Amino acid sequence: MNKKKYFSKIYDQFVDKIYRFIFLRVNSEEIAKDLTSETFTKVWHAFQNSEIKNLKAFLYKTARNLTTDFYREKAKISHASLENLPPIVDPKRNPQEKVIFEERMERIRKGLNNLREDYRQAIILRYIDGFSIKEISEIMERSPGAIRVLIHRALESLKRECNKKEDFSSS
């Protein structure tokens, strides 16, 4: 199989995943589409000119770097919202269980939005995108041990965020 056909298969396999990865960071469909396109363009050029050992990790690393560059250029920091993710609903649940489940999911979304960026990124890569520790270490450019610690701390922080009681009293 030639490089063009192989890369076309890689594109088809990862375009939606890379888009979601970027969208969760920029919270804009238009910007996410542009950065996704730019990611695949850069990876294609690198793919033509050199051997890439782990193409999946290289794709995510490139997407992460382009997202970081985007925020540097705009000189603003925006926390990506997870509220636009489609709800996860089990049709077998009764209405009361569905309400409780949705409330929990909303707490998790809010908790994730309140985490620092590297914690949020580690949790998303591990539990939403399904990456291994090794793959996350390549994407985030840290050792596997550091990633394990980061994920542990991120989960502890997320647990604290989700357990916070919302204050509805007026200040």
Say what each PLM segment does.
Residues L85-N113:
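Acidic, proline/glycine-rich intrinsically disordered inter-domain spacer in sigma factors
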Residues I18, I22, L59, A63-Y71:
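Hydrophobic-face residues of short alpha-helical interaction/recognition segments
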Residues I22, R72, L115, L155-S171:
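Short, Lys/Arg-enriched C-terminal cap helix and immediately downstream tail that follows
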Residues D34-T41, H45, K53-N65:
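Structural recognition of an alpha-helix C-terminal capping motif at a helix-to-coil junction
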Residues A122-R126:
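A short pre-motif secondary-structure segment
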Residues R64-L82, F101:
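Arg/Lys-rich amphipathic alpha helix in sigma70-family domain 2
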Residues E138-K164:
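DNA-recognition helix of helix-turn-helix
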Residues M1-R20:
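A short, charge-rich alpha-helical start-of-domain segment used by transcription regulators
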